[in-house]
C-alpha cells in the first residue's frame, strides 16, 4: 500500500517533467525525423537555455523575456552547428559534438555572469522570483500548477509548428530532409534549410532547458548530459505506440510529447521499485535500444512479403 501511495503521489511530477522534456523531444524530432540529421548539440543547448534563463531572472528580467532569450541562445547554438556542417564541410554528427563541447565553457561563462567566475550550479527560488513553473505547485489544484501551464504551452507550440511546417519555407525544410538531391533540383537552397532546421530544433531544446531550470529550482552545468538519448527515447516510444494511429503532422509532434511523459512515468515506476539512480542512464539506453529494435523485428519477422507463384508459365 505504501508503494502504491508513493507511486500515485509521484505521478504529477513525472507528468510535469514529461511535458517539459516533450518540448525538447519535439526539437529532437525536427532534426532526427524531419531533417534526417543526427544532431548532438542538444546536450549543450539544453544547459544553455537553463543558464540564460536563470541568470536573466536573477538579474530582474521578466520570466517571459528570459525564456525568449533562452530560445534565441539555443537558436544561436544551432546556427553554429549548421555553419560547421554546411560552410565548413564538417559531418553533422561531429559538428554537433564540437558545438556541444564548446557550449560547456560557454555555459560556465554565462552562469558566472556577475559573480566573477564560472559557476556549475545556480539556484533560483520561487519564493523570491515569479517563475512560470515550479515543482512546488505540481500537486496544487490551481492555475499555477505546472501541468496545466505546460499543457497550454505544448498545445500552443504544436499549433505554431504545425502552421510553420505548412508554409512554403516549412515545406522546403521537410523536402530537404526527405530528399536533398530532389530539393536542390526544385531550386531549394538545402544549406539554408538545414541551418534553419538546426536553429529551430535547438531553440526548442533551449526553451525546454529554461522551463526545466525554473521547474527544478536551479540551473546546472550537467543538466543537459544525456538529453539526446532521452529525446530519442521519447520520439521512438511515441512512434512505436502511436505510429499507426497518429498520421497527421501535429499528432506526430503530440506523440513525441506523450512519449516523453510515458518515459518519465516508467522511470518513476522503476525508481519506486528500488532501482538506484546510478543505473538510470543504463536503463534509458536499454529502453531506446528496445524501442529501436521493435520496428526492425516487426518488419523482418512479422511482415509477410509478396508470395511468388511458380510453375511452368513462370519458368
Regions from the PLM with identified roles:
Residues 205-282:
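Transmembrane alpha-helical segments in multi-pass inner-membrane proteins
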Residues 17, 93-94, 123-127, 146-151, ...:
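Loop-to-transmembrane alpha-helix initiation sites
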Residues 61-101, 106, 155, 258-259, ...:
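Alpha-helical transmembrane segments within multi-pass membrane transporters and channels
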Residues 6, 178-185, 189-192, 251-254, ...:
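Cytosolic-side transmembrane-helix boundaries in multi-pass membrane proteins
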Residues 32-87, 140, 245, 272:
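Membrane-embedded helix boundary and interhelical linker motif in transport proteins
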Residues 92, 96-166, 196, 220-221, ...:
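Transmembrane helix-bundle core of multi-pass membrane transporters
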Residues 77, 143-224, 228:
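Helix-loop-helix "hairpin" substructures at the membrane interface of multi-pass membrane proteins
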Residues 1-24, 52, 59-65, 133, ...:
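Membrane-interfacial amphipathic/re-entrant helices at transmembrane-helix boundaries
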Amino acid at each position: 500500500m505504501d508503494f502504491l501511495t508513493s507511486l500515485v503521489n509521484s505521478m504529477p511530477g513525472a507528468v510535469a517533467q514529461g511535458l517539459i522534456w516533450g518540448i525538447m523531444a519535439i526539437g529532437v524530432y525536427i532534426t532526427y525525423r524531419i531533417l534526417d540529421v543526427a544532431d548532438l548539440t542538444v546536450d549543450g543547448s539544453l544547459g544553455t537555455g537553463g543558464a540564460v534563463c536563470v541568470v536573466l531572472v536573477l538579474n530582474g528580467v521578466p520570466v517571459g523575456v528570459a525564456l525568449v532569450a533562452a530560445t534565441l541562445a539555443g537558436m544561436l547554438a544551432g546556427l553554429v552547428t549548421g555553419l560547421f556542417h554546411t560552410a565548413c564541410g564538417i559531418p553533422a554528427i561531429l559538428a554537433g559534438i564540437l558545438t556541444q563541447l564548446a557550449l560547456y565553457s560557454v555555459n560556465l561563462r554565462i552562469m558566472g555572469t556577475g559573480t566573477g567566475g564560472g559557476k556549475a550550479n545556480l539556484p533560483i527560488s520561487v519564493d523570491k522570483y515569479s517563475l512560470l513553473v515550479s515543482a512546488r505547485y505540481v500537486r496544487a489544484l490551481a492555475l499555477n500548477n505546472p501541468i496545466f501551464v505546460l499543457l497550454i504551452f505544448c498545445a500552443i507550440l504544436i499549433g505554431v509548428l504545425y502552421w510553420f511546417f505548412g508554409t512554403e519555407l516549412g515545406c522546403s525544410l521537410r523536402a530537404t530532409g526527405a530528399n536533398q538531391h530532389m530539393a536542390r533540383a526544385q531550386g531549394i537552397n538545402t544549406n539554408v534549410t538545414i541551418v534553419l532546421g538546426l536553429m529551430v530544433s535547438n531553440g526548442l531544446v533551449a526553451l525546454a532547458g529554461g522551463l526545466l531550470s525554473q521547474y527544478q529550482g536551479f540551473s546546472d552545468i550537467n543538466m543537459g548530459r544525456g538529453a539526446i538519448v532521452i529525446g530519442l527515447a521519447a520520439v521512438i516510444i511515441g512512434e512505436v505506440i502511436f505510429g499507426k494511429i497518429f498520421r497527421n503532422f501535429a499528432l506526430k509532434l503530440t506523440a513525441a510529447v506523450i512519449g516523453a511523459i510515458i518515459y518519465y512515468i516508467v522511470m518513476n515506476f522503476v525508481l519506486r521499485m528500488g532501482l538506484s539512480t546510478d543505473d538510470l542512464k543504463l536503463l534509458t539506453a536499454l529502453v531506446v535500444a528496445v524501442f529501436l529494435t521493435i520496428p526492425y523485428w516487426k518488419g523482418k519477422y512479422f511482415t509477410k512479403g509478396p508470395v511468388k507463384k511458380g510453375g511452368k508459365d513462370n519458368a
